A protein has these predicted regions:
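Short, conserved charged micro-motifs
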Residues: 98-105
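Conserved hydrophobic residues forming the short capping helix/wall of the S-adenosyl-L-methionine
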Residues: 59, 112-113
Length: 113
């Protein structure tokens, strides 16, 4: 993709990206969607959505060459009339040089759910 944008036809591979996967769980409290007022909800999916946005912003801050993706989310109990009590997502991070230090920086997301 980068070579196309730069108008270069041929490139030489200088490295292979490292891939780190995280399984992330957000826990809330399941309850009936019709009778639980907004102020009393602890929606795990809303918490996961906030965490995904914060992690994406953090990835952008850390490096122009780090990529971050969430490709899968499972919500429990998974009913449209029930507030989700749990959301589990797979976070994937790719970079040429993923050190323990950069992993620690990525994991540090200050979020008050």
């Amino acid at each position: 993709d980068k070579l196309d944008h730069m108008g270069i036809d041929v490139g030489v591979v200088s490295g292979i990206v490292s891939i780190i996967d995280y399984k992330v769980t957000a826990k809330g409290m399941s309850n009936h969607a019709g009778t639980t007022m907004m102020a009393n909800r602890k929606d795990a999916l809303v918490g996961m959505a906030k965490l995904i946005v914060a992690a994406e912003e953090r990835a952008r801050e850390l490096s122009d060459t780090l990529v971050f993706t969430v490709g899968k989310i499972a919500v429990s109990p998974g009913q449209e009339n029930v507030i989700p009590g749990q959301a589990v997502a797979t976070f994937e991070m790719r970079h040429m040089e993923i050190s323990r230090h950069s992993q620690k920086k990525f994991r540090t997301v200050n979020l008050n759910l």
